[in-house]
Amino acid sequence: MASRAAAGLLLCGVALVFLVLLQGTQSVYIQYQGFRVQLKSVKKLSDLEGQWAPSPRLQAQSPQPSVCHHSALPPDLQPICQSEEAASIFQALRTIAGDDCELCVNVACTGCS
C-alpha cells in the first residue's frame, strides 16, 4: 500500500515538473504588419529604449529608430529596422504588449471586453 502511494506521489511530481517545463517553453507572439515577434522581445525593446541614449549625431545620420543600432536588440525585432515604418511599428508593438486585452494572456482568453 505504501509503495502505491509513493508511486502516485512520484507520478504527480513528474507531471508537475513536466507542466512547469512545458509552460516555460511556450512563448506568446505578436503578429503585426507581417512581422511576428515574441512578447518578451517587445518588453526588452522598452527596456532598451529606457536605458540607452544614442549620440545626437547617430540620430541625425540614420532614419531608423535609435534602438535599431543597439547591439542587444532581439533578433526577431531586427527585420523591423529595415522597414520605412519601423518607428510606428515599434510604437504599435509597445502599445499591443502593454494592453492585456490585445493579447490572449490567459488560457480561456476571458476577462477583456
From Swiss-Prot:
One of its GO terms (biological process) is renal sodium ion absorption. Its main location: secreted. Disulfide bonds join 68-81, 101-109, 104-112. It is found in: Secreted. One of its GO terms (cellular component) is extracellular region. Pfam families: Guanylin. InterPro entries: Guanylin (IPR000879), Guanylin_sf (IPR036382). One of its GO terms (molecular function) is guanylate cyclase activator activity. The keyword Zinc-finger does not apply. Residues 1-27 form the signal peptide. Keywords: Disulfide bond, Secreted, Signal. Residues 28-97 form a propeptide. Belongs to the guanylin family. Endogenous activator of intestinal guanylate cyclase. It stimulates this enzyme through the same receptor binding region as the heat-stable enterotoxins. May be a potent physiological regulator of intestinal fluid and electrolyte transport. May be an autocrine/paracrine regulator of intestinal salt and water transport. This is Guanylate cyclase activator 2B. It comes from Sus scrofa. The lineage of its organism: Eukaryota, Metazoa, Chordata, Craniata, Vertebrata.
